Amino acid sequence: ISSSYVGNQVRTLFREKSAAGKKPSEIAKEVNEVLFNELSEFRFYCTAQIVQIFFDTDTILFLSAGHPEAIINRDSCRDIKLTGNQSPVIGLFNDENYREEIIRLSTGDSLLLYTDGIIEEHSSDNQEMYGVNRLIDSLNGTENFSSSEILHHALGNLYEFNGYRPQNDDITLICIKKT
């Protein structure tokens, strides 16, 4: 079975479960059961970050399964921190428990989601990895930036670190900012 076929099936599962109004933990648990029960012999698994935004309450339900913790940039107190919740990858083990986190965003706050390809990127001399601390440091002073400006600033910092070399891994960066 090709991974692209499985990827399409997993995407469809996520969409179906999301459209049914389920919470991120329920979505992850149900997709995990399907992957484990139907594809465990092939050892297929996936990582995911599931985000549900509730504009009426300024809250986000967030689940990270096998991805690095997201970064919350609090504008009001100039505080940048990691979310405190990580769940296992989806599809490898039966009967996993997944937990979402409730994040409340105030005006000016942002949530940064990223893949491990960013923090595992190597310096131009291959002596060190970028790491989560450098990513967090790249967000200092971006409180008044738009989400697009935050992304450009963070990626510019990363590319400067790696000497603008071609990437070896996927690099995905998403910024959700409350305006």
Cite the ranges covered by each PLM segment:
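DG-centered beta-turn motif at the end of beta-strands
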Residues: 67, 115-117, 170
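Sensory beta-sandwich core in regulatory modules of signaling proteins
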Residues: 63, 112-113, 173-174
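Activation on terminal intrinsically disordered regulatory regions flanking enzyme cores
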Residues: 106-109, 165-179
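Short gly/ser/thr-rich secondary-structure transition/capping motifs
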Residues: 43-45, 91-97, 156
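Catalytic core of PPM/PP2C metal-dependent serine/threonine phosphatase domains
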Residues: 1-84, 98, 162-168, 176
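Active-site-proximal, acidic helix/loop segment immediately C-terminal to a metal-coordinating Asp/Glu
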Residues: 1-21, 80-81, 105-165
